[in-house]
């Protein structure tokens, strides 16, 4: 997934299908494996470990969408890092993909020029475009869909305490996402 992402660096024509494929192969697979192995080590049966793998894939994908949004709509205090680093390095993020799909070729071309000579002062211009096309809200809707998939996957987890703890992670990520873009 990381290699695929590096191959698409600076590609403003990247579509959502390819973007999500990268997420599944990158963060999704990492979370999926961790959850699957954790379930196996805890004595889960094959059905339960498969469900935990599905949960991890969905949670990891949701987390990556959140991280993409945090980089554009968060605060430096909340992010613990400078904002706009993904766009500065040419990484494709869901809000930017949505912007390019909806805004048309003029804004996409202007964005391409901005990225080539990126400076943090341009983040407010980009945020204006992202806001105009409601890309945060659309990204959050996709994140919530992934979190719903994660919760659905937990139906096969027998231990209610473990299931509740994993569901709590989805609620926490949802709350963090809901706080983005709020001044």
Q: Where on the chain are the PLM-derived regions?
A:
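All-alpha prenyltransferase/terpene-synthase fold signal
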Residues: 1-183
């Amino acid at each position: 997934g990381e290699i695929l992402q590096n191959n698409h660096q600076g590609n403003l024509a990247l579509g959502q299908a390819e973007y999500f494929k990268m997420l599944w192969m990158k963060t999704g697979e990492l979370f999926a494996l961790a959850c699957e192995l954790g379930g196996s080590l805890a004595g889960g049966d094959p059905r339960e470990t498969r469900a935990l793998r599905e949960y991890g894939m969905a949670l990891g994908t949701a987390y990556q969408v959140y991280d993409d949004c945090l980089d554009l709509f968060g605060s430096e205090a909340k992010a613990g890092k400078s904002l706009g680093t993904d766009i500065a390095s040419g990484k494709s993020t869901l809000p930017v993909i949505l912007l390019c799909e909806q805004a048309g070729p003029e804004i996409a071309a202007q964005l391409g020029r901005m990225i080539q000579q990126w400076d943090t002062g341009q983040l407010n211009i980009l945020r204006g475009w992202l806001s105009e096309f409601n890309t945060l809200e659309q990204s959050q809707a996709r994140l919530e869909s992934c979190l719903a998939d994660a919760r659905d996957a937990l139906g096969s987890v027998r231990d209610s305490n473990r299931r509740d703890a994993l569901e709590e992670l989805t609620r926490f990520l949802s709350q963090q996402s809901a706080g983005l873009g709020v001044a």
